[in-house]
Amino acid sequence: MANTLFDKIWDAHVVQKVEEGPTQLYIDRLYCHEVTSPQAFAGLRARGVKVFRPDHVYCMPDHNTPTHDQDKPIEDPVSKTQVDTLAKNAKDFGLAHFGMMDKRNGIIHVVGPERGLTLPGMTIVCGDSHTSTHGAMGAVAFGIGTSEVEMVLASQCILQSRPKTMRITIDGELGKGVTAKDMALYMMSKMTTSGATGFFVEYAGSAVRNLSMEGRLTLCNLSIEMGARGGMVAPDEVTFEYIKGREHAPKGVDWDKAVSHWKTLKSDDDAVFDKEIRFDAADIQPMITYGTNPGMGMGITEHIPVDDKSASFKKSLDYMGFQPGESLLGKKIDYVFLGACTNGRIEDFRAFTSLVRGKKKADHVTAWLVPGSWMVDAQIREEGLDKILEEAGFAIRQPGCSACLAMNDDKIPAGKYSVSTSNRNFEGRQGPGARTLLASPLVAAAAAVTGVITDPRELI
């Protein structure tokens, strides 16, 4: 019987199927951060239960960590409590913990792949919706709730209903200035934020195959924003080259055995998906959002739609201060944020730096450039990107989720416009009253140096 990549990994991890109910699925890796794990550990204590497979669990703070002065105590009491509680829980239960200032620390969805903890064929969960990021490595990865975190801690298994399968094929070549982020925003603009609800998505096609590992991670990161349970890309030589030599990757003979197995992790030629969607890469241009959900996006040279008369559409535009039919080109912006688990990797910093090289940041723009991890930070400095950025008027902050969400010091003031490389533009996501425009690192860089929304292709 022909199987999809998802089927192969899912079926290999089934412990038992509950009759007319969910599947008991074995989990290879559980990642925990400080926000969704405290109640799970409290539940274990209340029941007197130990962690079943402590060697399969990795903990690190990221949401609440400040992006400056990390060597000092966190000032916000709530943030400090959450970060300290995670450290205590990890110690008490004997779990790996990458705390602040630990050079292994960073955003959990950046650290997992770069440390070789996330590997093809794995099942991976975390109490975070953007766990789908790890699917780029050829894994079945998805976000779970706190009660489910407790379930995995206690048993290394989870009860899940099997999602349907979808394949999104993107063929052709991306044009100048078009990135994986633009691919994702384009898909969402066509499919809406509910277009993949109930499905696990496999991305395929020549445009996907030609993406770097970082690009694939960005693509899978945004799967949840289409309503998908998760997203994945079949592993190939790009994947293997990325993993080889990383800290937790297999070594020697084990590496050869692993790669041999990983090469079998692909959908069979005659595998049948529940739904198939196709896009042409040539139709995609640099994208930007204009509303208050990630599906409200358009090509940067396009105009805000005029045919949507719904109350929710009007409410969204009122919040953003925009009008139907308006072009965003030349619109003054106030903040630029480069970072998040969507675009906080080395390739994103290279792209941003390539555009601002030899230019200067607009005086009125506040720019937060936040590496996704200390490893990314080190590579930025090894490649001399920090010097180029400093000459252009930018500074590198310390790793963390930062302005992706208003849960730490990096908040956008009310009414201000932020061109952000993160993944969500909901009302108040970056701060009460903040107006978020999601975009790629290149679009963010163009806005940072011109002070207005600019087509990056004009500056490349």
Curated annotation (Swiss-Prot):
Gene3D superfamilies: Aconitase, domain 3. Signal peptide: none annotated. Its cofactor is [4Fe-4S] cluster. Its EC number is 4.2.1.33. Pathway: Amino-acid biosynthesis; L-leucine biosynthesis; L-leucine from 3-methyl-2-oxobutanoate: step 2/4. The keyword Metal-binding applies. GO terms for biological process: L-leucine biosynthetic process. [4Fe-4S] cluster binds at C341, C401, C404. InterPro entries: 3-IsopropMal_deHydase_lsu (IPR004430), Acnase/IPM_dHydase_lsu_aba_1/3 (IPR015931), Acoase/IPM_deHydtase_lsu_aba (IPR001030), Aconitase_4Fe-4S_BS (IPR018136), Aconitase_4Fe-4S_dom (IPR036008), IPM_dehydratase_rel_enz (IPR050067), IPMI_cat (IPR033941). Belongs to the aconitase/IPM isomerase family. LeuC type 1 subfamily. Heterodimer of LeuC and LeuD. PANTHER family: 3-ISOPROPYLMALATE DEHYDRATASE, HOMOACONITASE, MITOCHONDRIAL-RELATED. This is 3-isopropylmalate dehydratase large subunit. It comes from Phocaeicola vulgatus (strain ATCC 8482 / DSM 1447 / JCM 5826 / CCUG 4940 / NBRC 14291 / NCTC 11154) (Bacteroides vulgatus). The lineage of its organism: Bacteria, Pseudomonadati, Bacteroidota, Bacteroidia, Bacteroidales.
